[in-house]
Structures are given as structure tokens and as C-alpha cells.
A protein has these predicted regions:
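Terminal or standalone catalytic/regulatory effector modules within metabolic enzymes
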Residues: 1-6, 237-240, 251-460
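Active-site mouth loops of central-metabolism enzymes
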Residues: 33-49, 68-71, 94-107, 153-161
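Structured functional modules or segments
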Residues: 469-547
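Conserved, mostly hydrophobic/aromatic
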Residues: 67, 123, 174, 197, ...
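Hydrophobic faces of well-ordered beta-strands that scaffold small-molecule active sites
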Residues: 1, 28-35, 65-66, 91-95, ...
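Catalytic cores of alpha/beta
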Residues: 106-111, 160-175
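Glycine-rich, proline-tolerant flexible connector loops at the mouths of alpha/beta enzymes
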Residues: 1-18, 36-42, 65-76, 99-100, ...
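Alpha-helix-loop-beta-strand connector modules within alpha/beta enzyme cores
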Residues: 8-33, 80-96, 137-154, 198-210
Length: 547
């Protein structure tokens, strides 16, 4: 999410960020989370792209790679692990912990042995949803320590309130390392507080040796920084016990809150949380960690908002069912799988075995786009090329506007204290992506209205608004096809006057970081197309009309 957020919202080059951090912390190993064959994107990449990405991360200052696969398909870890080892860096193989009828302690032990056999230097238990219970943690760590010889590290989120107790039981069982966050940046969607864990272990055989007074200096430094970015946190104030049932990780929870708000459907949160376990079961009890958390989450939102389960199936959900992401822990729903396979067979081999080397092709595409758009590249072209390879549309948009801060989200205002009075009612002008918006805010800080503005701050004319949001005029003839979600038009797959049959893909919509294929519900002729590629659309807005 860090890489994505840098180019999507901040207008910041993530490669520069790595270099700058390494520059001020030359003695401290820099660690990154790498999604195996997914890298940082939302699909599988060819082996040559994976190897080149690892090369560049090492070149820019990363030396510890926590490598995992969202499906826990160990085959998807191998290329990234091999390349990390080849470059002399630390490869930490990871199991994505989850709870389901098919996930047993023996399954985790078998995965750990596979990771050790790959040559990984250490093992991480990644408890992204905070589902690891303290006594289960003790038994799991105890058995893993007996099964493998490499060091074991625990990464547990605090969202459910279990993490600190689980950390202590893991320590008692012999865990080698645990992840924590400095106190002022800890808990809720994050991790247990470093200060607290250090204090708990102070008089034990596993005393850390860390100085609480020095930790307090760090704590104090980050306190106002957390306040500065508080608007981007979720609504959670204590613990969220719903996660013990829905198994939604904290990062996914905040993401879903924001996404539902963007869809004007914040009131549907509980319905979506209830739908998530059902979708997860249909998709073979896959763990909920990026990118599968987004895949399951987006599909759940679609099922709720459209009023019909799987009326619209995202490209990524179909990919899970087809085997494009690897093997699932349990069998997927057969009827749903048959619907997306359309008579073909699911993939059973390592998915990347079916992907031809693509680095050269990506470079040719990239060079063509750069030349057409007149984009100025970074000093090291390969950094920009990899940004494009992982995030084609967002990456090019970032590269085009790298020197235009108005295109991206404005930086939040610095605040001196977390104690703020309720926001006053008022009207404000905000600039984003080169456009101005007039925003009306109620007492308490809720946005009640947002309209595009002209350069002088007045509400924009209709013609100005059409540059920002696609034309909403609905033709009177035929059946209008509306957008199931708010998002951006990625591709228009048909032309005006084209004949289509039931099931044909009409438009690909990028919404909630996923690609959603909008298909024809019946055959006919496209009589009007109301949008073009790159347009922003809202829920229900007419995309095209079929007669």
C-alpha cells in the first residue's frame, strides 16, 4: 500500500523514499514486505519482472525481504526468495495466518518446512487480522520451533485486542523476534506498543535491554505526527470484536470504510462485514491479506450494493476461481467456478509458469507511452519502468504529474495537539488533481456537499464539471447500463452501433483498486456510449445504452 499510496495520492516517488530513508539510517537494515509473484501489484508477474524488481529494491537500499503469498501457495514465494538469496540479502519466508475449518497447526508446520527448504533465513508468522489467540500462539510457536531451525518472528495486529497477550505467550514459547510499534503509533489497526512489551518483559528471562526513557523520546516525537494524519485513520477507538467473526484485517477495515464512504454507502458496512466470510468460503477460505483482502472485500461490496450475489464478478475474483493466483486452501464453490471458466479448465500449475517473460514487452509499451506523452523520466529509467509495470494507469498518471503537486492530495495541516474543537460549519475551496472543488462542511466536520469550482472559486459551469465527471445524460432509447461502483473508466471494450451478446464485456471499471468487468445482461446493439477511458463515474451513472 505504501508504494501505491505514494504514486496515487502523495505525488511522491517511492524509490526516492527508500533512498532517503537509507541515507539517514545507513547502519539499519531496511525491510520491505513483498507479495511473492504479485510483487506490489494485483496480478502475477513473470519471473524476469520479479527478479528485476528485487534487483532494484536491493540497489535502492532494501536488504531484508519479508516474502509472502496471499494464498499461502509456497510455489509463489520461490522466485523472489531465490533472487534475494542470490543477491546476498535476507529472505524471510512468511505464512499468512488465518482461521478456517481447513487451517490446522500441521498445515502451518508443513508450510514452515517448505520455507526452510527454500533456503529462507527466517520465518514470519503474519497475523494481519489479529486472529492469533494467546494459547494458540504458544502451541504454534512451540511446535514450529521443534520443526524448523531458522529464527521465527511474529507479526500481529492489535485490532482485536489479542496481540499483546499473544506476543507474551509466543515469547514464553521461544519466539525469536516480535513486531511492535512505538507507543504513540500503536494499537487499533496497528501493533502492540513497543514500550508496553519492553516493560512487560523487564523482569523476565527475555528482557529486551531497550531503554524505556529513550523509547519515550521517540514516542513524544511521533505523537504530533499521528495527530497530523489522524484524518486518514479509521473510526476504531478501542478494539473491534467484529473481526473475530468476519476475520477482516485492520488495514482492510479502514480501506473498506473509506471505499464505502466514496460509494455513498457507509451505512452498508455491517452488511458487507457479514458478506465477507461467505465470499471467502466461496473462494476456498483464502487468507485475507493483500491482494486477496481487496479481492474479497470488493466482491463483497459488489454483492451488497447490486442486491444480488455475484451479479457482477470482478476480474480478480474470477482470477482466484480460475487458479490464476495459485491453489486455494480449500476447494472453491464449483458452480461459481463453472460460471467464470465458461467451459475451460482451471490452472493447476504454478501460475507464473504460464506467463512468458514480459520485461522487454513492458519496456516497449513504456517507451511508446513516454514518447507520445512527452514524459520526463527519472535519472534511473528502470525505477519508472517498474512503477509502470506494477501500476500501469496510476503509474503513468504519476509520471505525467510528478512535478505538479496540485494534481495530488494536499498535505494535511500540521497540528500542535490532538485536542481539537469540533469543526465549524463553513465552505472551503480545495484543489485536487488540477481541479478546484467547493466543499461545504457541517458543524462536526462532515462534508455535506462538494462541487467542482471555476478558477475564481465560484461553482463551475456544467461544461467544466464534465471535464471532471463523465456526462450523465441518459439517452431515451434502449436500456441504460449503469456503473455498479464509483471509480474510473479503465477500458471501453465496445464501439457505438456494435452488436453484443449476453455476457460480452462492455466496460472495465477500476474501482477500489480492482478491475470490474461490466457485462451485457442481454444481447442488442450499443446505441450510445456516454463515457470515455479515464473518466470518473459515480454509482448508477449511465455508461452506455443497449437497444
Amino acid at each position: 500500500a505504501t508504494f501505491d499510496s505514494c504514486i496515487r495520492y502523495l505525488g511522491e516517488d517511492p524509490w526516492d523514499r527508500i533512498r532517503e530513508i537509507k541515507k539517514v539510517m545507513p547502519k539499519t537494515p531496511q525491510q520491505m514486505l513483498l507479495r511473492g509473484q504479485n510483487l506490489l501489484g494485483y496480478r502475477h508477474y513473470s519471473d524476469d519482472v520479479v527478479r528485476k524488481f528485487v534487483d532494484q529494491c536491493v540497489e535502492n537500499g532494501v536488504s531484508v525481504f519479508r516474502i509472502f503469498d496471499a494464498m499461502n501457495d509456497m510455489r509463489n514465494l520461490k522466485t523472489a526468495t531465490d533472487q534475494t538469496i542470490k543477491l546476498g540479502q535476507h529472505a524471510q519466508g512468511t505464512i499468512s495466518y488465518t482461521v478456517s475449518p481447513v487451517h490446522t497447526t500441521q498445515m502451518w508446520i508443513d508450510m514452515a518446512k517448505e520455507i526452510e527448504d527454500m533456503g529462507a533465513h527466517s520465518l514470519c508468522i503474519k497475523d494481519m487480522a489479529g486472529l492469533l489467540q494467546p494459547y494458540v500462539a504458544y502451541d504454534l510457536v512451540k511446535q514450529l520451533k521443534e520443526a524448523v531451525d531458522i529464527p521465527i518472528q511474529l507479526h500481529a495486529h492489535a485490532t482485536t485486542g489479542l496481540s499483546t497477550a499473544s506476543i507474551i505467550k509466543a515469547v514464553e514459547a521461544g519466539i525469536d523476534r516480535v513486531d511492535t510499534s512505538i507507543g504513540s503509533m500503536s494499537m487499533t489497526y496497528g501493533h502492540s506498543a513497543t514500550n508496553s512489551v519492553v516493560s512487560i518483559l523487564e523482569n523476565s528471562p527475555r528482557k529486551t535491554g531497550l531503554d524505556l526513557e529513550k523509547l519515550e523520546e521517540i514516542d513524544a516525537y511521533f505523537r504530533p505526527i499521528r495527530c497530523k494524519y489522524a484524518q486518514f485513520e479509521g473510526s476504531l477507538k478501542g478494539v473491534d470484536s467484529r473481526i473475530l467473526l468476519s476475520q477482516v484485517p485492520g488495514g482492510m477495515l479502514t480501506n473498506m470504510e473509506n471505499q464505502l464512504r466514496e460509494q455513498n454507502a457507509a451505512d452498508k458496512m455491517d452488511e458487507v462485514l457479514a458478506e465477507i466470510p461467505r465470499v471467502r468460503k466461496d473462494l476456498g477460505y483464502i487468507p485475507l491479506v493483500t491482494p486477496t483482502s481487496q479481492i474479497v472485500g470488493t466482491q463483497s461490496v459488489l454483492n451488497v450494493l447490486t442486491g444480488e450475489r455475484y451479479k457482477t464478478i470482478t476480474k480478480e475474483s474470477a482470477g482466484i476461481l480460475k487458479g490464476e493466483y495459485g491453489s486455494t486452501p480449500a476447494p472453491v464453490d464449483k458452480a461459481l467456478q463453472a460460471k467464470v471458466l465458461e467451459g475451460s479448465h482451471p490452472i493447476t500449475c504454478r501460475p507464473a509458469d504460464n506467463i512468458a517473460p514480459e520485461m522487454h514487452i513492458l519496456e516497449q509499451e513504456f517507451d511508446t507511452i513516454v514518447a507520445e506523452k512527452g514524459i520526463t523520466l527519472a535519472k534511473n529509467k528502470i525505477d519508472d519502468l517498474l512503477t509502470y509495470a506494477l501500476f500501469p494507469q496510476v503509474g503513468i498518471s504519476f509520471l505525467e504529474n510528478r512535478d505538479n503537486p496540485d494534481f495530488f492530495e494536499p498535505a494535511p495541516q500540521v497540528v500542535d495537539t490532538c485536542a481539537k474543537p469540533d469543526s465549524e460549519e463553513g465552505t472551503y475551496t480545495v484543489s485536487f488533481k488540477g481541479a478546484s472543488y467547493t466543499v461545504e462542511v457541517s458543524a462536526g466536520g462532515n462534508v455535506t456537499s462538494m462541487k467542482a469550482s471555476s478558477d475564481d472559486g465560484a461553482p463551475a459551469s456544467a461544461s467544466t464539471e464534465k471535464e471532471i465527471v463523465a456526462d450523465e445524460v441518459t439517452p431515451t432509447e434502449g436500456e441504460a447500463i449503469g456503473a455498479p461502483l464509483s471509480g474510473n473508466i479503465w477500458k471501453v471494450m465496445v464501439e457505438s452501433h456494435q452488436k453484443v451478446v449476453e455476457g460480452d464485456v462492455l466496460v472495465i471499471l477500476e474501482a477500489m483498486k480492482m478491475e470490474t468487468e461490466i457485462r451485457a445482461a442481454k444481447g442488442g446493439v450499443v446505441v450510445d456510449i456516454s463515457i470515455k477511458e479515464g473518466d470518473s463515474v459515480t454509482v448508477g451513472q449511465t455508461l452506455l445504452t443497449i437497444a
